[in-house]
Amino acid sequence: MNNKTFINLRRSHFQKPQPLNQQIVNLALNADSHAFLSNPASQNVYLYLTNYVEAFSENWFKKSLSELKILDWGCGKGHISYLMQEIGVQVTSCDVFGADDSSFGQNTPIIEKASINVVPLEHPYILPFKDRTFDIVLSFGVLEHVPDRLASLQEIHRILKPSGLIFCFFLPYYLSWTQRLAHLRGDFYHDQLYSKKMVKKHLLQTNLELLDIWHRQLLPKNSISYGNYRTFEVIDQWLTERTPLKYTATNIEFVACKSQLVN
C-alpha cells in the first residue's frame, strides 16, 4: 500500500453509506451523556470510521479483522467496542479507573447491554498488557486527554506487534473554529490542541511511522440535527479535503504503524 492507496481508501470508506445502528439509538436515549449517539449525523461518523478501520486493516495485514487482536484504548461509553463486536471482532476494551468520564465513572448502558468487559487502567500511562500483544490500537478521542502523550505513545508502541497499527481519531486541531469557540465559552474539555507538525514530531520520537494524516469535521455533528445528514457529511468532507477551510476543521486524524525493524 502506498500513500495514494491510503488516501483513496479513506475517501471511499468515509463516504460509504452505513445503516444506523438502532440498538445504539435505543440505548442512547436512556442516558443524557449518550444522546449524541442517537443523532444520525453523529452516529454516522462512528459507523464510517469503524468501517474504515476494518477496510484499512484488512488491506494492510491481508487478513480478516476477526483474526487480529484489537485494543479499544479508553473505550469510554463502549460504542466503538460494541460496533467492533457487531462486525464479528473480539476486541479488548480498557479505560482509566476512577475518572468521571471513563467507563467506570458514568452510566454505561451500551457496555452493560453488550456485556463488554473493561480492563481498568490504574496508571497514568502504563498499560497492563505484555509486549507485542496487539495488531491494532484504537484511539477514539483519547490521546488528547492523557497526562503524558509521549509516554502513552511509547506504551502503544510497546504493546503493538511489528507492523501493528494505531488509528487516532478526534484529535482536536489547534486552529479549529469549534475548539476556539468552546474555549471562549469557558469549555476547556479539550485543553490540549494539536497541529500536524506536533503529531509528526511525537510519532518520530516514539518510533511510529505515519501512514496517513488528514483534517476532518468542519460542521458540528453532536448537537445539531441535519435533515439529510449524509449529504451534509459529503459536503463537510469535500470542504475539509478540497478547500482552505480544512485549516479550521475540528479534528486532525491519523493512522501510523510500528516498524517491523524496531523492537
Where are these regions (language model features)?
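A conserved beta-strand element that flanks and buttresses the S-adenosyl-L-methionine
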Residues: L138
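Hydrophobic adenine-recognition pocket in adenosine-nucleotide-binding enzymes
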Residues: V142
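S-adenosyl-L-methionine-dependent methyltransferase catalytic module, highlighting the catalytic core
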Residues: P147-E155, L165-V262
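A structural alpha-helix within SAM-dependent methyltransferase catalytic domains
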Residues: Y82-Q85, L153-H157
